[in-house]
Amino acid sequence: MITVYTPEEVEKISAAGRLTADTLSMLEKAVKPGMSTYELDELAEKFIRDRGGIPACKGYEGFPATICASVNDTVVHGIPSRRKILKKGDIISIDLVVQLNGYMGDSCITVPVGHTNKKNLQLISATEGALFAGIKQAVIGNTVGDIGHAVESYVKPYGYGVLREYVGHGIGIGMHEDPEVPNYGTPG
């Protein structure tokens, strides 16, 4: 069931989202060859806690870290490690959920580690374009199918597909709320 939040609650969700975005922006600037994914995790936790937030992934269903750090072909939910050292040319997806004043913010970025190859840059560009194509369809009168169709249609010409096992979702008091938003769908 979809929760309908009051304007005041939406502002609190937005504040959690802003802290999430600020944390990801800081991490994007911090990513460099030679650092471990564990170091990124430590930076994220300190940044969030210093601003009154709580790293919501840490301890969630036993997850041991603040961020999910997925390097190269790790699809999602990579666990930060002192042994996972970033190399020039890698790409890393950093997924993060922040709780602030009882409300959640959730976002992910994918960035190159130093300079990377054209194939990786194309993947980053195509997935970012797909995100914005989906957002463009998130308007009154459209369906979740319109959003998913836009995402999948955007990446197909690049030779990419979507993972049907993983979906977007609502956010609010809970980390994963309805509706589920697949990256595929039928418009209308």
Question: Which ranges hold each PLM region?
Answer:
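Active-site neighborhoods and metal-handling regions in enzymes and metal-associated proteins
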Residues: 1-188
